[in-house]
Amino acid sequence: MSCLACAQPSTTPFCESCAKLEYLELIRTSCHHSTSTNPVEMAQALMAHPRFPAAGQAHHPLVAGLLVAAYRNAGGDANIAEMDAAIQRANTIPGGFCAGFGADAAAIACGIAVSVIEGATVKAEHAVARSLAHTLTGQGLLLIANNHGNRCCKRSVFTVLELAAHFFTATMGVALTPPSGRVECAFSAENKLCNGADCKFYPAVPPVKAGPRLAVLG
């Protein structure tokens, strides 16, 4: 078995060192070492880390970083510095953004990934790059807007990464790996505001709560 973050041999999903990482360094470490082209699968692994919050700001850099990493792993032209830039930029979006600012940050994080990959600026020569970023963000926002009930960061992450896998394949010149079947959330028992069977990612067999997790609201 290899550590899901640093990819070094480990007897547990996360090695002793990586199990102690806070979310930002966890995301960086995993993005630097991952070879996966499946961003949903990557997100499921990292959100299962014992120190990854149940909700909140951590989900924003998760989305941006994993998309740049998956793009790079699929043969796209992206480097470690760009990966780190996407992570850092998305981490500036505060928790609770979805409720207070009129846009879900998971969707914005998708646009951040595209902007970093394309090197978008405000100049005319980057109009196409901005359009690509805005299109993915907009599509993500529309999907999230059609969700009902309590806000859920996991639901937003699954929604936009599933979308982005298809978007990147269609428009970004690389083939990301989409989920092979229906995505099932393994975190419903950790969320006191879980929408249960009303959520399209609610598992057929709901998981039993394994233990306490950081509950950062956002």
Task: Please describe what each predicted stretch is.
Residues E118, V122-T169:
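A structural-propensity feature for long, helix-poor, extended segments
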Residues E184, A204-A210:
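Long, Pro/Ser/Thr-rich low-complexity/intrinsically disordered regulatory tracts in eukaryotic proteins
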Residues R155-C185, C199:
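C-terminal domain-closing interface element
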Residues A45-Q57, T92-G102, L143-G149:
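A short glycine/serine-rich beta->alpha loop
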Residues P61-A74, I80-E82, A86-H134:
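Conserved mixed alpha/beta catalytic, RNA-binding, or beta-rich assembly cores of soluble enzyme
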Residues V208-G218:
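Long, compositionally biased intrinsically disordered regions
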Residues T29-G65, N150, C185:
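Polybasic, low-complexity association/targeting segments
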Residues S2-Q8, E16-S17:
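Short, cysteine/histidine-rich loop/knuckle motifs that typically chelate Zn2+
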